[in-house]
Swiss-Prot record:
The modification N-acetylserine is found at S2. This is Lysine--tRNA ligase, cytoplasmic. There is a cross-link at K308, K577 (Glycyl lysine isopeptide (Lys-Gly) (interchain with G-Cter in ubiquitin)). The modification Phosphothreonine is found at T62. Residues 28-45 have a biased composition (Basic and acidic residues). It comes from Saccharomyces cerevisiae (strain ATCC 204508 / S288c) (Baker's yeast). One of its GO terms (biological process) is lysyl-tRNA aminoacylation. Homodimer. GO terms for cellular component: cytoplasm. Its main location: cytoplasm. SUPFAM superfamilies: Class II aaRS and biotin synthetases (SSF55681), Nucleic acid-binding proteins (SSF50249). Pfam families: tRNA-synt_2, tRNA_anti-codon. One of its GO terms (molecular function) is lysine-tRNA ligase activity.
Length: 591
């Protein structure tokens, strides 16, 4: 081809090219179409990808309370509530909230609801304390409400709320521990991850009834420190369901005993708690002073002498459930202030009371726990140690003196010689030979009581120990079979005494002589011995019918039925040293 033809061909080729505006290149028409089409496809992909990108996360609301320590929390919350007290928007302490159904009744009534089922027309209003609060976005909030010993879930959605504009404000005000009132409809939730869902209140309105100014202990760590639990029992009850259940069981014990006696035509009475003479038991009393009468008085150690005076007066069956006060040591099973039940029945004796005791306690255990057999862990230092206590009838019965002779392999003096000085030397020798220590004064009664402790340690299942010496029982009637002994029994469970009963001494001459013997022991230094009660002796002179008397410790019963190894667990407010005094003692010990 000539040079002229080449130039012509090149010119025609250029004339057929088109500008690619994206790159500035000159390309053929087909190439340009190809490129444009490719770019359109890529543009669509980019647009689709951009549409799929998540929206920028909205900033979460700042929780002013989230990172505060307990002291800062209290100060901040107090300021918040103080402001509401001024503005009443809302009033943080309203006078009334109408509750239409209790929390346990609510759960029971709607337990039949199926997963995801709701009843928009079924309106309820309930109340309780917030134990948990969580959010799922800004339009859905969950609460766990505690009340009457159960948990109820609250589910609050913006769409259900009575005033959408106040939704955030109302919920932001509520904190863990607050007491709230809730209105809404009923339903069962439908969790995405499976499960049956929770019977819940779908909230239409929530109202703060009482704010909690303090930070509650975290659920994860709990509220476990014993000393703090006893000092702040209110917080213990808020945080620990077991604590609440223990005191419900204690109430059931008292209710059962009261019903048992009421059904048998006993009359419940009340007798004085302050007395001129501390009588009715062998114990050291508290002394108080009556300003108007300008005289010292004793807090009662037992109601026995008053109750027997009522039987003299013709009230043949009487009982009293109440507090007693003994100025003695504090340990795992003793508190200076404690609760007993005592009853007295005319024309009954110690053997009738044995049968009543077996019946009362065995059926009480069955009714409250569902079985005659309960598990008990006596040693806090050894949680694995477990006792099986069988309350079914009949119970084992041990004759005190006969069993002591077996245990110590000696022959005891006859019952009518147990009070003599010779017997005192005999008892001292047994104590020395067996390396047993009895705190002074070494009266025969105290030394015998120490020896009987060796029998008590063998009593695991409920056991009667009977046949006590008269000198150990100044208010019990003498044995009709064995001189020097009396008609008395004690019941021991897991080595602890829970019950004491006897045929009552109704001979005024014998009673006065016994009181005088007690006075002699008091002169020997026994602070627990009784004084002569002339008022009671005078009442006996009018005639006390043959009578059986019975007493039991409510606190120890509660310990066994709640599996508590310390009496403090079953006393709402046990006796404790004040915090300030406790700190002083601690510093002295450290120094």
């Amino acid at each position: 081809m000539s040079q002229q033809d080449n130039v012509k061909a090149a010119a025609e080729g250029v004339a057929n090219l088109h500008l690619d505006e994206a790159t500035g290149e000159m390309v053929s028409k087909s190439e340009l179409k190809k490129r444009i089409k490719q770019r359109q496809v890529e543009a669509k992909k980019a647009a689709k990808k951009a549409a799929a990108q998540p929206k920028p996360a909205s900033k979460k609301k700042t929780d002013l309370f989230a990172d505060l320590d307990p002291s800062q929390y209290f100060e901040t919350r107090s300021r918040q509530i103080q402001e509401l007290r001024k503005t009443h928007e809302p009033n943080p302490y309203p006078h009334k909230f109408h509750v239409s159904i209790s929390n346990p009744e609510f759960l029971a009534k709607y337990a039949h609801l199926k997963k995801g089922e709701t009843l928009p027309e079924e309106k309820v209003s309930i109340a309780g304390r917030i134990h948990a609060k969580r959010e799922s976005g800004s339009k859905l909030k969950f609460y766990v409400l505690h009340g009457d010993g159960v948990e109820v879930q609250l589910m609050s959605q913006l769409q259900d709320y009575c005033d959408p504009d106040s939704y955030e404000k109302d919920h932001d005000l509520l904190k863990r521990g607050d007491i709230v009132g809730v209105e809404g409809y009923v339903g069962r939730t439908q969790p995405k991850k499976g499960g049956e869902g929770e019977v819940s209140v779908f909230v239409s309105r929530v109202q703060l009834l009482t704010p909690c100014l303090h930070m509650l202990p975290a659920d994860h760590f709990g509220f476990k420190d014993q000393e703090t639990r006893y000092r702040k029992r209110y917080l213990d009850l808020i945080m620990n369901k077991d604590a609440r259940n223990r005191f419900i069981t204690r109430s059931e014990i008292i209710r059962y005993i009261r019903r048992f006696l009421d059904q048998r035509k006993f009359i419940e009475v009340e007798t004085p708690m302050m007395n001129v003479i501390a009588g009715g038991a062998t114990a050291k009393p508290f002394i108080t002073h009556h300003n108007d009468l300008d005289m010292d008085m004793y807090m009662r150690i037992a109601p026995e002498l008053f109750l027997k005076q009522l039987v003299v007066g013709g009230l043949d069956r009487v009982y009293e459930i109440g507090r007693q006060f003994r100025n003695e040591g504090i340990d795992m099973t003793h508190n200076p202030e404690f609760t007993t039940c005592e009853f007295y029945q005319a024309y009954a004796d110690v053997y009738d009371l044995m049968d009543m005791t077996e019946l009362m306690f065995s059926e009480m255990v069955k009714e409250i726990t569902g079985s005659y057999i309960i598990k008990y862990h006596p040693d806090p230092a050894d949680p694995a140690k477990e006792l099986e206590l069988n309350f079914s009838r009949p119970w084992k019965r041990i004759n005190m003196i006969e069993e002591l002779e077996k245990v110590f392999n000696v022959k005891f003096p006859s019952g009518d010689q147990l009070h003599t000085a010779e017997t005192g030397e005999f008892l001292k020798k047994i104590l020395v030979d067996n390396k047993l220590e009895c705190p002074p004064p070494l009266t025969n009664a105290r030394m015998l009581d120490k020896l009987v402790g060796e029998l008590e340690d063998t009593c695991i299942n409920p056991t009667f120990i009977f046949g006590h010496p008269q000198m150990m029982s100044p208010l019990a009637k003498y044995s009709r079979d064995q001189p020097g002994l009396c008609e008395r029994f004690e019941v021991f469970v897991a080595t602890k005494e829970i019950c004491n009963a006897y045929t009552e001494l109704n001979d005024p001459f014998d009673q006065r002589a016994r009181f005088e013997e007690q006075a002699r022991q008091k002169d020997q230094g026994d602070d627990e011995a009784q004084l002569v009660d002339e008022t009671f002796c005078n009442a006996l002179e009018y005639g006390l019918p043959p009578t059986g008397g019975w007493g039991c410790g409510i606190d120890r019963l509660a310990m066994f039925l709640t599996d508590s190894n310390t009496i403090r667990e079953v006393l709402l407010f046990p006796t404790l040293k004040p915090d300030v005094l406790r700190e002083e003692v601690k510093k002295e010990e450290e120094n």
